[in-house]
Every structure is written in C-alpha cells, then in structure tokens.
Amino acid sequence: MIEFKPVRLEDRAVIERYTMPSGICNCDLAFANMYCWQAVFHSAWAEIGGFLVIRFQIDGGERIGYMQPVGEGDFGPILPLLREDAHAHGQRLRIIGLTDEGRDTIRRIVPCHFAFESDRALEDYVYNADDLRNLAGRRYQPKRNHINRFTAEYPDYRYEELTPDRFGECMALEREWRKAHEGHTSELCAEQRAMQRAFEHFEELGLIGGCIYVGDRLAAFTYGSAVNDHTFDTHVEKADTEFDGAFTIINKLFAQHLPERFTLINREEDLGLDGLRQAKLSYHPAFLQHKFAAICMHPDEVACKELWMKAFGDDEQFADSFIMRYYSRRRMLTAEAEGRMAAMLHLLPFRTELGRTTYIYGVATDPAFRGRGLASQLMREAMRLIAERGDDAAFLIPTPGKEWLREFYGRFGFAGDVPARFVSADRFDFGTNCSSFK
C-alpha cells in the first residue's frame, strides 16, 4: 500500500515542485486549497515513480479519489499501484480532476476498463488575466458601466492590500454574508473553517489578497494563490451587497494588482448554480478547465458498456455517465450466450403520480444473438419481479421509429401512450417520450 502523508505546511515546496511547472489549471492543485480544505477532504499526498499523487475523501467521506498524477511523462505505469491502494481500502480506483490529456492517457493505456464523466458544475472558469484587468471592448461595456456607477456613488472608495490587520473585518463580513445564505449551512461552515485556516497561515500559504473600502467600511475582500507558474486561482471573493458593484470593482482591481507573470486567472466552478453560472459566463472565460472523473469498471460493467454500445450506438460519454451514476448489478437482468453477456435490461425505481414505479430501461440484445428469445426471457423475469415487489406501475419507452416494439411489449401487458419524462435529481435524462405503461 502506498504511504500517503497528510498535507502539511512544510510540504508546500515539495508539492509545488510538481504543480507549478505542470501547466494544469485545476484549482484543486493549488496548495492553499489542499491545505485549507483538509478538514473536509482529508488531503494526503505521495510521490510515486516521479509523480505527485493527491488523495482525497469524496462523496461525504464515503469514498476516496485520486487526483490525476502530476509529473513529467506518462503516468500509465503507476495506475496499477493506485488500483492496489484503492483495493486495500476496500474500494475501486477513482481518478478525479482529469484533464482531456489525462483521460486520453488512461484510454490508451487501459482501453475499455474505465468509465469517464465530466460534471459541468465542477469545471473551472479560466480567464485571460488581461481581460479581467482591462475589461476592454464592447462585450465588457456592462461591467465598465457597473464600475462607473459604483465610483460615482462611492467616491471615497479605495483599494487596499489584504493584510493580517484586516482579517478580523473580513471574517465579520463573511459572517454577515453567511446569514443571508443559511440554507446551505454545512457547506458555508466548512468554507468559514477553510477561510480561518487561510488567515492563520496567510504568508506561509503564498496567499495574495485585496480589499475595497468605502470610507472606513469594508465593502469587499478577496484572496487566492498560484495554481501553476502562470495561473492564479481566486479562492474567495466576498462583498457587502449593500454596495452595488462591489463584486465587479474588486474583481477588476484585484486582477490589476496581481503580479504580471499571471496570464490566466481561475475563478473556480459554479457548482451548478444558475445565478453563479451566469455571473461567471458574463466575464467571458478563455476556456473551461475540464475535470473528468474516471472509475475502474468491474467486469460486468465492462460487459454492460460493450453491449450498450453495440445495441444502441449511443456515444461513449452517455454510456459512461449511466454506468457511473446509476448502474447496479442488483437492478440489471442479463442473459448469457457463448460465455458472454448477450442481453440485458435495467429496472430503475422512480416515484411518479401513479406511486412507486419501475422504469424498464436499456432493453438490449447483442445483434449476434437476436432471434433467440433472450429479450422475451428477460421481460418475463422483469414483470415477475415487479409484481412480486408490489409496484404501482411499470413504464418503458419503445425506441422511436421501431413500431414493432409496441407489439412486442404488448405481449407483456404494456399498452397506451402516456407523456412522461424520467429525469433524476441530477438531471440525467433517461428518456422523454410517450411511454407505454402497465
């Protein structure tokens, strides 16, 4: 098992020896983020075969994830070591924060053994630093107008460097801001603890910050640190909403006061919040830093994916997303032929206006084994299980354009068209169409 060590202040030089020249813009690689959020994610690190590997606890501490290894060359040879470490903790290997290149490396080294997914809500917004410093051109006119209104209304405003004597005021402003967002108490308390840790070790963490004052009153503050040699990451930005335009002006002035070596500014993710997404898009990012997650699939998941791709022709990303989020061997019925998975279907539980409902999803037969009655065999078993559970209804959506499927499913009691949409809480679309139901 790999010897991982908790991230400590004295580890900064070793960790940044890998991250600074990497060119990777992922905010999770900022040493200050690793250290300040350690109470939540239990960040740990190890050097393996010339690479830095960061290990986190994810999903509320239920699972562990490994960041994309950072170093020179191909990290493929250390994947077996990471897999062994994960297995020693009773888990499958999960790699998070993968760049496009990192994903492609894994696909090349171990094809068909990993499923990949990129969550739009977790992608970092990365901007050209000069765009934020200057706000030049027509597309930034609304931002300039906002700043002009602020400076006209508050002519006594001033920008100051964030120094230790101002930390108390910043925490007081953060507490007031938190009162207005009490619906997310646990997340905000964790952020407050991370801020407190940042202020306790501001200089040692290499943090840089700025403040806006109106008279003697703190209107906004922000701080961050380097992700790599040319990318700065804004970790925190808070403002008193009584001062309209405070967020806009501190964004610009802070960018102007950063060292010129920073040509990119990472303003982190939007967490899927519509208002935050629109605000970040309004500054016109140069690009979004993808952060793919990958899981090492079990043999039955590999077989499910292979059959899915053969039968439906969906893109690989869709199949991977389904497997990573919703696949369960307990909810999948299969038929085998010649030593491999030849047919399958999935029984997905939903709550609808009809009550407890099973959605029969992904009914598929390998083209090489069609005409043998395998799908009929699985449908009979599915209907038996649904009846045994006492579900109130069962739905399925026949593949559009294949009218013969209506007659096929009719043999099992499905009839009628009911407009239905099966979308999960995380917005995964299982199908929107007229459904047959029983």
Which residues does each predicted region cover?
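Conserved beta-strand in the GNAT
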Residues: W45, G49-Q57, C211, D216-A226, ...
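Conserved GNAT acetyl-CoA-binding A-motif
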Residues: H89-T99, E260-E268, M379, I386-T399
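Conserved catalytic-core motifs of GNAT/GCN5-like acyltransferases
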Residues: E117-Y125, A286-M297, I397, G410-G431
